[in-house]
Amino acid sequence: MKIPPICCVITQLPQAETLKKSEGAAFYELRLDLLGENWRETAVLLNKPFMATCRRSAEGGSFKGNEAERINRLEKAASAGAFMLDIEYSTPNLEEVLGRLRPQAKCLLSHHNFTDTPSAAKLKTLLKDMLTHQADIYKVITTATSINDNINLLNLTKEIPDKKIVAFAMGEPGILSRILCPLAGSPFTYASLNDGNKSASGQMTLAQMIEIYRSVNYANHT
């Protein structure tokens, strides 16, 4: 059965049995800020590639160290096998950080808006600003306050067709864009390993996402 690539988010040390149920994932995202020192043990358990993310509190995470420590943790993740690193657009000295990390792993440049979803024009301007920095994938995530907000995010991926752009909205009203973003051009979408691993509002479990794609016969729509 064909389904879109799904990045399965892991926020706590998983049981081996739980990982066996995640075969439908294309790869994992390890939340280094939430896993703490357990991230290394978790990485060893994985049977698929993984991306590493280490969020500051301002970006919805829990990392309490300084920036040097945060970047160092991402470097350690790359050394441990992470094929991609999520770097926030708000990162201080962004160009320097990207220059330091890109030789070690692919970089996904991300922006998160935890308040609302800006207009289509503002999102386009934001994306163009992000594209002035060299990255492998660009991610724009907002918070939906209405169903209509999904449209702005789904259309955003079409603005620069030659770039890889992940765009969807958080929150219950944004679930639609989480499901449909691969059909709109996003290279992948996100899901949690299970209910205990959810890292954002509106995030569905991997099993739920797979069941939805199976129900609508996703392969016939691509």
UniProtKB/Swiss-Prot annotation:
Keyword Lyase: yes
Disulfide partners: none
Catalytic residues (UniProt): 112 (proton donor/acceptor), 139 (schiff-base intermediate with substrate)
One term of GO molecular function: 3-dehydroquinate dehydratase activity
SUPFAM superfamilies: Aldolase
Example GO BP: amino acid biosynthetic process
Pathway terms, separated by semicolons: Metabolic intermediate biosynthesis; chorismate biosynthesis; chorismate from D-erythrose 4-phosphate and phosphoenolpyruvate: step 3/7
EC number: 4.2.1.10
A Pfam family matched in the record: DHquinase_I
Residues bound to 3-dehydroquinate: 29-31, 55, 178, 199, 203
Catalytically driven reaction(s): 3-dehydroquinate = 3-dehydroshikimate + H2O
Oligomer and partners: Homodimer.
Family membership noted in the UniProt record: Belongs to the type-I 3-dehydroquinase family.
UniProt protein name: 3-dehydroquinate dehydratase
The organism of origin for this protein: Dehalococcoides mccartyi (strain ATCC BAA-2100 / JCM 16839 / KCTC 5957 / BAV1)
Lineage, uppermost ranks: Bacteria, Bacillati, Chloroflexota, Dehalococcoidia, Dehalococcoidales
Gene: aroD
